[in-house]
């Protein structure tokens, strides 16, 4: 992801997105630079309108962020149901123990 972030930073500041600039940003951030990944990034971004891609991604991410609280509530409800089931199983096991006790 740091390679993408470097490209986005360069784009936002109006700098040219090329191998040298991406390497400089990554090195300044203290990241290890893999020349092959830098070249692949530059090649992949060659025909991409970064501004359009950022807008499209921001719009697509908004609904996902809104759905996150609902998912958290569902997970919490499932955890409560599991606890109730475990308690019922423990009570049933205790009752069976009385038969042999």
Swiss-Prot record:
Pfam families: Ribosomal_60s. Residues 73-92 have a biased composition (Acidic residues). Residues 61-101 are annotated as: Disordered. GO terms for molecular function: structural constituent of ribosome. Residues 61-72 have a biased composition (Low complexity). One of its GO terms (cellular component) is ribonucleoprotein complex. Forms part of the ribosomal stalk, playing a central role in the interaction of the ribosome with GTP-bound translation factors. Part of the 50S ribosomal subunit. Homodimer, it forms part of the ribosomal stalk which helps the ribosome interact with GTP-bound translation factors. Forms a heptameric uL10/P0(P1)2(P1)2(P1)2 complex, where uL10/P0 forms an elongated spine to which the P1 dimers bind in a sequential fashion. Belongs to the eukaryotic ribosomal protein P1/P2 family. HAMAP family: Ribosomal_L12_arch. This is Large ribosomal subunit protein P1. It comes from Methanothermobacter thermautotrophicus (strain ATCC 29096 / DSM 1053 / JCM 10044 / NBRC 100330 / Delta H) (Methanobacterium thermoautotrophicum). The gene is rpl12.
């Amino acid at each position: 992801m740091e390679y993408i972030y470097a490209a986005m930073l360069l784009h936002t500041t109006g700098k040219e997105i090329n191998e040298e600039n991406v390497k400089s940003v990554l090195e300044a951030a203290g990241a290890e630079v893999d020349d092959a990944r830098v070249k692949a990034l530059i090649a992949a971004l060659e025909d991409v309108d970064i501004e359009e891609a950022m807008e499209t991604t921001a719009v697509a991410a908004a609904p996902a962020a809104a759905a996150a609280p609902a998912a958290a509530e569902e997970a919490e409800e499932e955890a409560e149901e599991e606890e109730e089931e475990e308690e019922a199983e423990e009570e049933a096991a205790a009752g069976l123990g009385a038969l042999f006790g």
